[in-house]
């Protein structure tokens, strides 16, 4: 399968929000791909409390703006909440704010703190991206929701809403949904060898189709697994593709609760994060808490054909994505995370959002470094 065929196949599953039909279908597809690569691959069931959104909106000045509830926030009664709009942090009953979806990429982010300290009865947040459509925030506290009801709306509504907030315009907001048992799965693939293993880690779920956000990491994960299975090596390999990324890394939490040594004691955790090979966004963060390893990865990327200038190479600092789960558990990680103008937006689709040449170069470089670490 060529890189182009891989991205097209990935994109064809459509929306892969955790617990949905696309999530289940793409999980079995990826398990089969890992098995075909030469690994022993299985689905590891993950149960969770699933939030099912109902129609939600804000009405003001004769307009109804449809949106999506924040998945780790509260909901309103059927009649909603009526009151004046005002800037987030004001005394207005309904707070208004604009932000980028990446601003809430880690637990305890400033917006989460603002929600905890909020005096608002409800909040509406306009999410800004290149297409300015509805690009939801990740719900880090999906298993323990808190705070006032929050309505997420398209970024294109920000100027209108902020203007109303400055004038204290009256509005009504409805944020609705229910919670039910949900089911998803991690994929766990393994190659035999000596302990401690090399761990390949990538998230596989997202809010929408999210092709550039997720598929580049999965391509690198599969490419490395295929290379490791076909090459002489000494070390065992475990490859995890986890669900629930957008819901506070639920799949990673379940995996490392079941096998804490994987996060803590693996020879290295190679974290293949978001936006690897996204079109129009060459910036790529290469970060490790192992001295010299980020520089080695950067050299491998350049050797594979990735431009050097956009690489941000760092040792230490704050790990993001699932690498944060490794860092917080005392493990050694090497992490790759890129940028994406369509981040969390429904327009992140093949072929428009994918830079095939860079995605392929990243996958080749990851496979080369993985093979070195498993030698």
Q: For the regions a protein language model found, what residue spans apply to each?
A:
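Metal-dependent peptidase/peptidase-like ectodomains
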Residues: 194-195, 242-342
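Solvent-exposed loop/turn segments at secondary-structure junctions
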Residues: 48-49, 101-103, 128-132, 157-158, ...
């Amino acid at each position: 399968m060529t890189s182009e065929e891989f991205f097209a196949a990935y994109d064809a599953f459509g929306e892969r929000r955790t617990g949905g039909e696309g999530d289940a279908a793409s999980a079995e597809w990826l398990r089969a791909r890992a098995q075909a690569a030469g690994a022993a691959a299985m689905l590891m069931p993950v149960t969770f409390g699933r939030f099912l959104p109902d129609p939600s909106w804000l009405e003001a000045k004769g307009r109804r703006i449809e949106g999506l509830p924040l998945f780790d926030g509260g909901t309103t009664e059927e009649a909603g909440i009526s009151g004046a709009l005002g800037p987030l942090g004001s005394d207005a009953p309904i707070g208004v704010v604009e932000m980028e979806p990446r601003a809430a990429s880690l637990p305890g982010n400033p917006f989460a703190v603002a929600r905890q300290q909020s005096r608002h009865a409800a909040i509406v947040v306009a999410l800004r991206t290149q297409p300015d459509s509805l690009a939801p925030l990740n719900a880090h506290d999906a298993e323990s929701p808190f705070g006032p009801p929050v309505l997420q709306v398209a970024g294109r509504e920000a100027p209108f809403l902020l203007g109303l907030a400055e004038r204290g315009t009256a509005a009504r907001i409805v944020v609705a949904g229910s919670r039910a048992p949900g089911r998803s799965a991690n994929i766990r693939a393994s190659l035999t060898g000596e302990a401690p293993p090399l761990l390949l880690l990538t998230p596989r779920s997202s809010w929408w189709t999210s092709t550039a956000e997720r598929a580049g990491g999965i391509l690198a994960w599969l490419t490395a697994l295929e290379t490791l299975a076909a090459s002489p090596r000494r070390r065992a390999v475990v490859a995890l593709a986890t669900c629930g990324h957008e819901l506070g890394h639920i799949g990673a939490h379940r995996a490392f609760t079941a096998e804490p040594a994987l996060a803590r004691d693996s020879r290295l955790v190679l974290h293949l994060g978001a936006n690897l090979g996204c079109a129009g966004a060459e910036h790529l963060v290469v970060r490790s808490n192992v001295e010299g390893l980020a520089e080695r990865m950067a050299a491998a990327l350049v050797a594979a054909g990735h431009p050097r200038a956009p690489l941000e190479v760092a040792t230490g600092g704050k790990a993001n994505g699932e690498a944060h789960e490794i860092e917080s558990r005392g493990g050694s990680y090497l992490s790759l995370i890129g940028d994406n103008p369509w981040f969390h937006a429904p327009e992140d689709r093949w072929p428009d959002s994918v830079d095939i040449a860079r995605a392929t170069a990243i996958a080749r470089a990851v496979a080369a470094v993985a093979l070195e670490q498993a030698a």
